Amino acid sequence: MAKIKKGDLVQVITGAKAERGGDRGKQGKVLRVFPDTNRVLVEGINRVTKHTKVGQSQRGTKTGGIEVVEASIHISNVALVDPSTKKPTRVGFRTETVERNGKKREVRVRVAKSSGKDI
């Protein structure tokens, strides 16, 4: 089970400070997780300018130009935000026994290390 999933609120914990033009300390929602490269795409974080070549789309409209998009960031540079305290926290796991249709199953639940509450 992954510690960070799509839709989680994370905070950047490394890099340049926000007052110096960096993203450290900023919080954002995870848009996509790339498990093969250990990277995440976070909303509003690591924005870069992308220069695309001018061409034509199938509708005949001109495409291309300069656009600002989010680039991925390594998963070790972000920390999950505890929903109760709104501060970054480490993630742990706890197993719970759940009974469905008369069958017992063990389910792993993500837990915030700082507060001990479920995420």
Swiss-Prot record:
InterPro entries: KOW, Rib_uL2_dom2, Ribosomal_uL24, Ribosomal_uL24_KOW, Translation_prot_SH3-like_sf
Listed name of the protein: Large ribosomal subunit protein uL24
Stored HAMAP family: Ribosomal_uL24_B
Source organism, top-level taxon: Bacteria
Family statement: Belongs to the universal ribosomal protein uL24 family.
SUPFAM superfamilies registered for this protein in UniProt: Translation proteins SH3-like domain
Gene Ontology annotations of biological process type: translation
Originating organism: Arthrobacter sp. (strain FB24)
GO molecular function terms listed in the Swiss-Prot or TrEMBL record: rRNA binding; structural constituent of ribosome
PANTHER family xref list: MITOCHONDRIAL RIBOSOMAL PROTEIN L24
Function recorded in the entry: One of two assembly initiator proteins, it binds directly to the 5'-end of the 23S rRNA, where it nucleates assembly of the 50S subunit. One of the proteins that surrounds the polypeptide exit tunnel on the outside of the subunit.
One GO term describing the cellular component: ribonucleoprotein complex
Quaternary structure and partners: Part of the 50S ribosomal subunit.
Keyword annotations of the record: Ribonucleoprotein, Ribosomal protein, RNA-binding, rRNA-binding
